[in-house]
Curated annotation (Swiss-Prot):
Keyword annotations of the record: Chaperone, Nucleus
Family: Belongs to the CHZ1 family.
Disordered as annotated region, ranges: 1-123
Function: Forms a chaperone-bound H2A.Z-H2B complex that acts as a source for SWR1 complex-dependent H2A to H2A.Z histone replacement in chromatin.
SMART domains recorded: CHZ
Gene name as annotated: CHZ1
InterPro entries named in the record: Histone_chaperone_domain_CHZ
Species this protein is from: Chaetomium globosum (strain ATCC 6205 / CBS 148.51 / DSM 1962 / NBRC 6347 / NRRL 1970)
Pfam families attached to this UniProt entry: CHZ
Quaternary organization: Forms a heterotrimer with H2A.Z-H2B, stabilizing the association of the histone dimer. Also, with a lower affinity, forms a heterotrimer with H2A-H2B.
Biased composition (Basic and acidic residues): 111-123
Acidic residues biased stretches: 37-73, 96-110
Cell compartments where the protein resides: Nucleus
Protein name: Histone H2A.Z-specific chaperone CHZ1
Length: 123
């Protein structure tokens, strides 16, 4: 037999793919190998040089942002409701709930027949 026409079920090499085995190229869940990206290190070196020059400029700006002014105690609000006992029965009597929702429901008229007639006309 010739070498080109023979098949080796255990993983024959394929001369067209640089000697890669057939199992490397085919199979469930196997994607073709992609070329690895080449990193450009020349830009990274330039960035390092720029960072050294910018560091002294940033330090004085940080000192200007400190505004340590006194806090006006009139603007501080106390403990409003923490620790207070609320009598909900008394609060309900003083502030009755609005019954507007129930009154609005009486005004609503549903037009079921009108919608059914329009559907029959379309057919």
């Amino acid at each position: 037999m010739s070498a080109q026409n023979s098949t080796d079920p255990m993983g024959a090499t394929n001369p067209e793919n640089g000697g890669a085995t057939a199992t490397d190229l085919k199979g469930k869940g196997r994607a073709p190998a992609a070329q690895e990206p080449v990193e450009d290190t020349s830009m990274a070196e330039d960035d390092d040089d720029d960072d050294d020059e910018e560091d002294p400029e940033e330090e004085p700006e940080a000192a200007d942002d400190d505004n340590m002014e006194e806090i006006d105690l009139d603007n501080v609000i106390g403990r409003r409701t923490r620790g207070k006992v609320i009598d909900f029965a008394n609060a309900a009597q003083e502030n009755p709930a609005d019954d507007d929702d129930e009154e609005d429901d009486d005004d609503f008229v549903e037009d079921d027949n009108k919608m059914d007639d329009s559907k029959m006309d379309e057919d």
